[in-house]
């Protein structure tokens, strides 16, 4: 079982342990989801600066933080959102069945709560764990953006994956 704790970036209601967990995930795994231009917090007190409005902490049955997910880069308008981009980060102890289970629940939640038609994910080619997770959840590879950003001072390709609403809601 998993739970999603919505974090309002304007009113941070995270425990010191949760802030520390987020900071640890960013330090350990940011190379898989951030480029050379990303703001990396130096300590837990800077974390609120980077949290987008649609950020959730993923908790297990015992309320232990296992990872975080967030949506940004929405396309559409408030009355009719079309798509959003998904970013995830899970601690190593959550890799495997927990991430598969929580990802499927979260994706359906996104389609239900936001009325989205599409969810996108941008992944570095060497991030095989996330690519496999996306495929298990129904995402398909849509394109590869050549030399899209810089990572460690070198041009970096980004693979784009998409998941459409009809995967969860067959017409």
Give residue spans per PLM region.
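Acyl-donor (CoA/ACP) binding surface of acyl/acetyltransferases
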Residues: 1-25, 53-171
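Generic structural signal of hydrophobic/aromatic residues within well-ordered alpha-helices
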Residues: 22, 29, 44-47
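Alpha-helix C-capping/helix-to-loop hinge sites
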Residues: 29-32, 93
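Short, positively charged
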Residues: 31-40, 128
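Active-site rim helix/loop that mediates acceptor-substrate recognition in acyltransferases
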Residues: 36-55
């Amino acid at each position: 079982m998993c739970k999603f704790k919505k974090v309002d970036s304007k009113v941070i209601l995270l425990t010191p342990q949760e802030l520390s967990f987020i900071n640890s995930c960013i330090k350990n795994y940011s190379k898989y989801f951030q480029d050379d231009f990303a703001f990396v917090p130096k300590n837990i007190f800077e974390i609120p600066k980077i949290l987008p409005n649609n950020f959730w902490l993923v908790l297990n049955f015992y309320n232990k933080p296992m990872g975080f997910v967030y949506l940004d880069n929405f396309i559409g308008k408030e009355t009719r959102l079309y798509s959003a981009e998904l970013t995830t980060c899970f601690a190593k102890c959550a890799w495997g069945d927990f991430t598969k289970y929580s990802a499927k629940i979260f994706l359906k939640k996104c389609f239900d709560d936001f009325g989205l038609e599409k969810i996108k994910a941008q992944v570095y080619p060497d991030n095989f764990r996330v690519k496999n997770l996306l495929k298990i959840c129904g995402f398909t590879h849509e394109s590869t953006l050549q030399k899209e950003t810089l990572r460690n001072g070198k041009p970096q390709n980004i693979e784009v994956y998409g998941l459409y609403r009809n995967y969860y809601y067959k017409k």
